[in-house]
């Protein structure tokens, strides 16, 4: 992809040079050096034939004496030269290119260039330069190319480049610079190409490049940049090519890009973008090529991500292992788009609406994707499809199993239905995620289907979050992104994304761990988890505990001592996440019970805490009923007869609306308070922490939770 003018130009020059024959130059030549007439291209790409003295790789410690007076190009690369005096080069009046790269210079002042007024190109890359003082290149008024890359420069004085008003190309990449000073560029009004990547600068400040009104190509690759300030590119009205390759940009620098309206080539490859959102690339009227490749975190290209790019002809979005979703309406008003490269991603399909939105599209690359050959990709085999597949024999179906490994273009049209289930890509978000307490969490869930699916999330507490939901902590965006602000340990647990349409649904779950894991696998059971007896009564016991962070589920079991000897049943309650107490009821008086709390955590390990408790002996008030089974039986019989009479009376009329008609009577043992003859299970939605006199609880989003329909209300 032609994103950077300078590298391509240099590659073209090298290729063209290799094709032109080298002619011997018959002059007295220094020992072991080669004197020839070679093709040469000026910094403005004009072709010339230059008299060349090649003394590369000769282990020289000084410039050879008695060089031919007509030398135009002097190559001294890969030697051990540490100093160049004026007397060694001053007599070479025609010298236009000097290559001193890969030598041993540590100070630019060790190079005396005052007597080289014709020099156009100077190579000092791959030396040991550490500083550039003011006026370091005085006397080089004609210089157009300066290569200082791959040194150890950590300081450049404000006027280091004074006198270089004709400089066109400056290479400062791969040094030790920590800041960029706009005063450097005040001396370079005609600079067209600046390569300053590979320096771990702290930040690019507003108007850092403002003096460079004629700059056409700017390379900011490999600088560990996390953000670009809104006015960092202010003043670059001539900029055509821009590279942010291999940085740490988590979002597209939209405001900064607005400052370069003439941009034609943009390279954002190898950045940790998670999504390209609406309007991230909008109204860039001259953009021709855009690269969004090799992004490990990229999940989706959302609706209207690319809007009003009238000159865009090629879009590269390749080698993104988690990119599983391109919205059907991701592209709008891209009339000149010809080539769409989407190979080697995690895409299950490319929607027909996406293709139809690109009226001039000629070819698309989808090879290397896990294509699901169903209704969404059906357009590929429709008659009259104008779009050509790049590498069609490598564009294969991954699903369904009976079409696996079959080229997409060879699947019969009738094999693909009109409607299909939603599919959430397994790579859209990881199975588990650790978040520091107090930070924000963002999860992206996307799905393609026909009809278009609805997406919502379910929290560990069972709260359903839809795009219409906007609480204090949670927010769901229309395309399925869940944002949780200021995460606490209470929000840890399983989050489920649900994508559904009229055909069916698909789900995907992520386990969220908040903060440092307090509980690690392999620790002794019960360590850090304690079950306490808060209150004991003749027929119920109140237990409490402190729920550790990152809890996924909590189960409480209890049984009497006789049950442990095989003479009774064990009861089980599945408790909602966040429950801190439970009231065990329907117990026998003066009886020992064994209760155990089992907690499961997000990292798949569990902990167990147990406690013994004994119910109190019933008082006279309790014995009035508790010790007189005959009286209880009479009362129960009376209740049964009353219920039967009431049922017979109601049976003669119509069922009451809104009540549901007749309901079956509960089993007889329920009236005596006896335990069920098998394991008693209390479902999670019907259990809440026991708190006498409590008001109706509310969720973290302010929604009222109904009280449990059990004896623990």
UniProtKB/Swiss-Prot annotation:
Protein name: Leucine-rich repeat neuronal protein 2
Ig-like C2-type domain boundaries: 422-511
Organism: Homo sapiens (Human)
UniProt keyword annotation of Ubl conjugation present: no
PROSITE patterns: IG_LIKE (PS50835), LRR (PS51450)
Intervals, Extracellular compartment: 19-630
Glycosylation sites: 94, 381, 555, 583
Transmembrane intervals: 631-651
Gene (name only): LRRN2
Topology versus the membrane: Single-pass type I membrane protein
């Amino acid at each position: 992809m032609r994103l950077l003018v300078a590298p391509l130009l240099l590659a073209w020059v090298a290729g063209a040079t290799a094709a032109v024959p080298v002619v011997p130059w018959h002059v007295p030549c220094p020992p072991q050096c080669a004197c020839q007439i070679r093709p040469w291209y000026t910094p403005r790409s004009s072709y010339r034939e230059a008299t060349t003295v090649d003394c590369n790789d000769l282990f020289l410690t000084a410039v050879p004496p008695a060089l031919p007076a007509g030398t135009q190009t002097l190559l001294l690369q890969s030697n051990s030269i540490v100093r160049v005096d004026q007397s060694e080069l001053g007599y070479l009046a025609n010298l236009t290119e000097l290559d001193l790269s890969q030598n041993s210079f540590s100070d630019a002042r060790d190079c005396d260039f005052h007597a080289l007024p014709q020099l156009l190109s100077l190579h000092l890359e791959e030396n040991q330069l550490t500083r550039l003082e003011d006026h370091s290149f005085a006397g080089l008024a004609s210089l157009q190319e300066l290569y200082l890359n791959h040194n150890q420069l950590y300081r450049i004085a404000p006027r280091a480049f004074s006198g270089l008003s004709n400089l066109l190309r400056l290479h400062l990449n791969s040094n030790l610079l920590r800041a960029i000073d706009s005063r450097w560029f005040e001396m370079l009004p005609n600079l067209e190409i600046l390569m300053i990547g590979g320096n771990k600068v702290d930040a690019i400040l507003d108007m850092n490049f403002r003096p460079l009104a004629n700059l056409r190509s700017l390379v900011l690759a490999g600088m560990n940049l996390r953000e670009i300030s809104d006015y960092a590119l202010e003043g670059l009205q001539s900029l055509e090519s821009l590279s942010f390759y291999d940085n740490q940009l988590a979002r597209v620098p939209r405001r900064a890009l607005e400052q370069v309206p003439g941009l034609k080539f943009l390279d954002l490859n190898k950045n940790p973008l998670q999504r390209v959102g609406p309007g991230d690339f909008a109204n860039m009227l001259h953009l021709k090529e855009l690269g969004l490749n090799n992004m490990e975190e990229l999940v989706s290209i959302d609706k209207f991500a690319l809007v009003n790019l009238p000159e865009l002809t090629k879009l590269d979005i390749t080698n993104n292992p988690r990119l599983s979703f391109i919205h059907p309406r991701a592209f709008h008003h891209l009339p000149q788009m010809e080539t769409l490269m989407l190979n080697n991603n995690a895409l299950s399909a490319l929607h027909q609406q996406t293709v139809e939105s690109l009226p001039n599209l000629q070819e698309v690359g989808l090879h290397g994707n896990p294509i699901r050959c169903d209704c969404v990709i059906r357009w590929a085999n429709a008659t009259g499809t104008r779009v050509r597949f790049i590498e069609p024999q490598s564009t294969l179906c991954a699903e369904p199993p009976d079409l696996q490994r079959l080229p997409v273009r060879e699947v019969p049209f009738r094999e693909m239905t009109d409607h299909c289930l939603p599919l959430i890509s397994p790579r859209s978000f990881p199975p588990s995620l650790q978040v520091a307490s107090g930070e924000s969490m963002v999860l992206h869930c996307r799905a393609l289907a026909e009809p278009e699916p609805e997406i919502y999330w379910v929290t560990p507490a069972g709260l359903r979050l839809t795009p219409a939901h906007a609480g204090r902590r949670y927010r769901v965006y229309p395309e399925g992104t869940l944002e949780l602000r200021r995460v606490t340990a209470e929000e840890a647990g399983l989050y489920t994304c649900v994508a559904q349409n009229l055909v069916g649904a698909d789900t995907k779950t992520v386990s969220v761990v908040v903060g440092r894991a307090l509980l690690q696998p392999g620790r002794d059971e019960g360590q850090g988890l304690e079950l306490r007896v808060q209150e004991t009564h003749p027929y119920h016991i109140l237990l409490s505990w402190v729920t550790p962070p990152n809890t996924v589920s909590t189960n409480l079991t209890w049984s009497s001592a006789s049950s442990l000897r095989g003479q009774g049943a064990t009861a089980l309650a599945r408790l909602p996440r966040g429950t801190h107490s439970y009231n065990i009821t329907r117990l026998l008086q003066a009886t020992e019970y064994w209760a155990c709390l089992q907690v499961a955590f997000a990292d798949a390990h569990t902990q167990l805490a147990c406690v013994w408790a004994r119910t109190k002996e019933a008082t006279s008030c309790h014995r009035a009923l508790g010790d007189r089974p005959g009286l209880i039986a009479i009362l129960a019989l009376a209740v049964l007869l009353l219920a039967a009479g009431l049922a017979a009376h109601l049976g003669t009329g119509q069922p009451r609306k809104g009540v549901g008609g007749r309901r079956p009577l509960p089993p007889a043992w329920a009236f005596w308070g006896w335990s069920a003859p098998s394991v008693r299970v209390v479902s999670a939605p019907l259990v809440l922490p026991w708190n006498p006199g409590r008001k109706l609880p509310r969720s973290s989003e302010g929604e009222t939770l109904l009280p449990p329909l059990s004896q623990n209300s």
